Amino acid sequence: MADAPIAVVTGAAQGIGLACAEALNEDGYKVILVDVQDSVHKAAADLGGVGMICDMGDVDAIGALFDTIEAEHGPVSALVNNAGIAMPGSFLDYDLDAFDRVMNINLRGVFVAMQRAAATMVEKGIEGAIVNMSSINAQVAIPAIPAYCASKGGVMQLTKVAALALAKNNIRVNAVGPGSIDTEMMAGVNANPEAFKMAMSRTPLGRSGTAREVGDVVAFLCSKKASYVTGETIYIDGGRLGLNYVMS
């Protein structure tokens, strides 16, 4: 895969990010898996990719990350901004440091990574693809995670802005918005029968999605099959956003 295009996936040590990396690897990309956790190295080795450590809330670290990738592997053709956190808390006394931390990773980090990847794409004439991880919580709110909901709404709008700004360079920018996906973030819901029943009552397909189902949509958006798709957020939610009543 010496001449394979380079794809970078953040938050790739597990869950949705790892599934995105797997799908892109199958599509012929050389995948750089990025995470703040050391376990990203094993995940990358198992996949035949490259693991790198980066805190996506640290602007300087993001710059250094892309410097290293470009120097050691070449310019990036596809970027998947998946890294994100959710820090719960009461709206009335939500900690501002927590708010800033969520925004720095979930929104500012996405912006900075897009800027850096896109600048090189423009310079090298690469007609690349960027996919950002939004959420159904860009559209529907959960009071206990105010910063997360706000950040994912921001990602949705920032995706549109970037898509319009980069269209003249044939760089496509899209987002995906997962619903209830069977990952570690949903482990608490899955372990609680009542909570799981409530989540499924709002999901017409009646089941959780899999991380790979998200990864496959991301890979599609990075592919030439989606060559006329830009500025969109595709919701992978089992029909949840279209529902205006509770399923029995």
Language-model segments: residues:
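Active-site helix of classical SDR
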Residues: 114, 151, 159
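Alpha-helical segment proximal to the catalytic Tyr-Lys
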Residues: 119, 164-168, 227
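Residue(s) in the substrate-gating loop at a strand-loop-helix junction
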Residues: 135
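Short C-terminal tail/terminal secondary-structure segment
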Residues: 219, 230-248
